Amino acid sequence: MDTGFADSNNDSSPGEGSKRGNSGIEGPVPMDVELAAAKSKRLSEPFFLKNVLLEKSGDTSDLTALALSVHAVMLESGFVLLDHGSDKFSFSKKLLSVSLRYTLPELITRKDTNTVESVTVRFQNIGPRLVVYGTLGGSCKRVHMTSLDKSRFLPVIDLVVDTLKFEKQGSSSYYREVFMLWRMVKDELVIPLLIGLCDKAGLESPPCLMLLPTELKLKILELLPGVSIGYMACVCTEMRYLASDNDLWEHKCLEEGKGCLWKLYTGDVDWKRKFASFWRRKRLDLLARRNPPIKKSNPRFPTLFPDRRDRREPFDRFGPSDFYRFGLRDPRDRFGPRDPRDPHFYGFRY
């Protein structure tokens, strides 16, 4: 494994603690004190990230800072680190890739960590971005990936480490960037790995939408707009089956199309198709109101007295074809457009 560590410790246990089980995070200030000092629920993730950075960082390289940020999300989600030989993370600035192995505390039942079901997280240093790949058991059959912009997240991570500076200068944009980093890593990498590892090891899956009862999932779909239900149908096969319920789409038609005469439809009606037609018409009407068509005058009966709001001359309303058809000439142009059938069309008349 191409991981660089500093300050090796031979007495370390095979797994690093997590927030889910035995945390094992022994910083200068306990986590409960940090959270109490935060005085706000929104600071839980930034202060947990700060604890991990202060405790595990062995250098100030960009790869170490971003890798520890991903490591903090893994710990918060319940993972523990395998095969670590040190309490400090220290990655060389010239290092292009790093791999780490994680597992769950419930799976550590033997001293031989090579036989434990695990996930592999690989960090690829590519120019201004750090690409993080996650695989189940090191297999490349299904790869989960997220990409982190260094110029976007590194200043926020540096600010999180300096608690006093973060509290004084930390505006809503800094908090938003911290939670954006946390959500990107958790949604795109950590949660899929956690679900896959639990399914492979026979453990109970983490709380998620698909584990809810069918009646509750249908109730959630009823509260969504019709367009959002269409998006939910693209999530998985089960959600597509639930979103195809005919009674659900009848309810959406009556709810969103109150001005339509839905009661005229009798018998077996495909309400999903009716809602799709209604939504297309509604969208076209909205576009028509935003971009009204230009009112054109009748070329056979030109307006002698133009509208005061329209400062153009009457002849300006005609196009080239109108000049050719009626033999008209632009009064401002001595040699205006003529009929192509005119023998003097390509030269002067005089």
Swiss-Prot record:
Residues 1-29 are annotated as: Disordered. InterPro entries: F-box-like_dom_sf (IPR036047), F-box_dom (IPR001810). It comes from the Eukaryota. SMART domains: FBOX (SM00256). It holds the Pfam family F-box-like. Residues 1-15 have a biased composition (Polar residues). Residues 206-252 form the F-box domain. This is Putative F-box protein At1g23770.
